[in-house]
Amino acid sequence: MHTELIRQSYRPSHIRLLLVGESPPASKKFFYVKSAMTKHTAQAFKKAHGASFRDDEDFLHYFKRCGCYLDDLCHNPVDDLSKPKREERLKASIDGLAQRIREMNPSVLAIALKRIERYVQEAVHRSGRQPRVFVLPFAGNGHQTKYVDQLREILCTYVPAKT
């Protein structure tokens, strides 16, 4: 199934927390299919809400029930591009993300990769919306614990547990 159809199937009607990543990876293991980021995000929810999940699918349904959604700055993979091409593609994606933020109107937005902060901040500005914005470290490359702990803090404050 196409990544955007999969992503849309997990979109809640009201988005409380919007996580923004860079792009789905070229490997096809993106958040809503099977990725390490899914597992680390589930770990933050377990710590914040005392929840347990049978598997990734169970977690993703809980994530949706909590009003959480993951979108990407760019909907096409950029991790296999040269740095100049990647930058070009990310800059070209700002207006699209701004439009989606305007339409979703999240209360909280968490940028899930520090290096895309300037693009996402510009998209937030162009959207005309004013969510509380947080920047998380990437959920890999040795930063998993920081990602989980910082996301847990956001969840404890802004995202109530669901049953």
Regions found by a protein language model. Give the residues of each.
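A polyanion-binding, active-site-adjacent surface
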Residues: 1-139
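A polyampholytic, Gly/Pro-enriched intrinsically disordered region
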Residues: 150-163
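Short, charged, surface-exposed secondary-structure boundary motifs
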Residues: 140-150
